[in-house]
């Protein structure tokens, strides 16, 4: 029989604690939510607050009259210091499509539920502080699509952007959230890339996954207020790109967003919609959030890129969606800026426009001039 001395006992307890913490770190954030659903004159706030072998869900009910006083609490099982609260809006408005040129812009894309990547990039590049306060002044943060699917913290990512929108406005800045293919897929029920965590959590909460983001939810309404494309100063910003077929529609940025909004979240659009413009905009090869022609063979001819720049009266097109070894980088002599990097594999970078210059930025806060490939 082994007798533990006080010293050995203390060491054993310490070792057990380290193993327990390490296991928790490996799991990441096992919480999910919160999700805010509207049901009649009630507000339901649902979340998964604990999960090991069994998922345990909680639900709180409020009246609509309590909405303005309600604070949504976003909690993290693996790192409580990341917790934050969100005040709800009295109403949600569709985003404008065209903006004047800000003095400072930070572009990110394809976060896909990697909350830590988003948070750490914003901290390192002095967009927020650790209290989630906006410190980017009159600068604009632009997310070029894809908030959903592979990562473990999609709701937290959405709520953070929701929160920062108001914080930025109070300081003269702005947050632009542009939808990508993964966002459109989730809202329309195409869940082929969805992490199992979210399906298990939805089941535990007694909801279908689709009910967590439909028109009767706060996040669902918020997402449906977002654009597919925006013109910000000299920049045309979207997720995938502009194909020749989209150019041929001869639509303005405002027109694209206006006619597309009713179809965000539309199921089986290909077989139920006859409008040729809508079918092209949402096309899974040539559409705004799917097109890869700037990077994949056969690459688009530069004359087509020039046509797009002239048609929308911009100097460059900024896109995510397609990962290349040379991103964050310029292409076509600086006419295309590709910003998609592999967030899931630890490549966390973005593009910063400041004082008339373009920089690649990372988690250290370092700035390097963006190369032309």
Feature annotation, model-predicted:
Residues 1-26:
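Bacterial Sec-dependent N-terminal signal peptides
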Residues 24-373:
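Feature recognizes metal-dependent phosphohydrolase scaffolds
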């Amino acid at each position: 029989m082994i007798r533990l001395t006080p010293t050995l006992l203390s060491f054993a307890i310490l070792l057990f604690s380290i193993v327990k913490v390490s296991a928790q770190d490996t799991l990441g954030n096992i919480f999910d939510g919160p999700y805010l659903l509207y049901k009649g004159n009630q507000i339901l706030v649902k979340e998964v607050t604990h999960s090991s072998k069994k998922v345990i869900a909680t639900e709180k009910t409020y009246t609509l009259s309590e909405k303005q006083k309600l604070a949504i609490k976003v909690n993290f099982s693996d790192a409580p210091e990341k917790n934050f609260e969100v005040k709800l809006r009295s109403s949600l408005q569709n985003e404008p499509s065209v903006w004047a040129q800000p003095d400072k812009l930070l572009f990110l894309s394809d976060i896909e539920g990697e909350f830590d990547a988003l948070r750490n990039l914003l901290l390192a590049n002095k967009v927020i502080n650790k209290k989630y306060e906006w410190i980017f002044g009159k600068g604009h943060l632009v997310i070029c699509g894809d908030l959903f699917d592979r990562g473990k913290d999609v709701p937290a990512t959405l709520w953070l952007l929701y929160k920062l929108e108001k914080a930025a406005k109070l300081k003269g800045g702005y947050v632009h959230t542009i939808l990508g293919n993964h966002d459109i897929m989730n809202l329309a029920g195409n869940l082929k890339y969805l992490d199992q965590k979210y399906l298990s959590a939805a089941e535990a909460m007694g909801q279908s996954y689709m009910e967590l983001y439909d028109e009767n939810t706060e996040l669902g309404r918020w997402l449906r207020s977002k654009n597919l494309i925006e013109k910000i100063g000299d920049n045309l910003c979207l997720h995938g790109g502009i194909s020749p077929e989209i150019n041929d529609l001869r639509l303005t940025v405002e027109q694209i967003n206006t006619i597309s909004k009713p179809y965000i979240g539309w199921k089986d659009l290909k077989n139920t919609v006859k409008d040729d413009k809508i079918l092209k905009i949402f096309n899974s090869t040539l559409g705004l959030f799917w097109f890869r022609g700037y990077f994949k063979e056969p690459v688009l001819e530069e004359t087509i890129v020039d046509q797009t720049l002239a048609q929308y009266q911009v100097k460059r097109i900024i896109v995510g969606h397609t990962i290349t070894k040379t991103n964050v980088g310029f292409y076509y002599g600086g006419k295309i800026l590709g910003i998609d990097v592999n967030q899931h594999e630890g490549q966390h970078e973005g593009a910063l426009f400041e004082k008339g210059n373009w920089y690649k930025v990372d988690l250290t806060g370092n700035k390097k001039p963006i190369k032309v490939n």
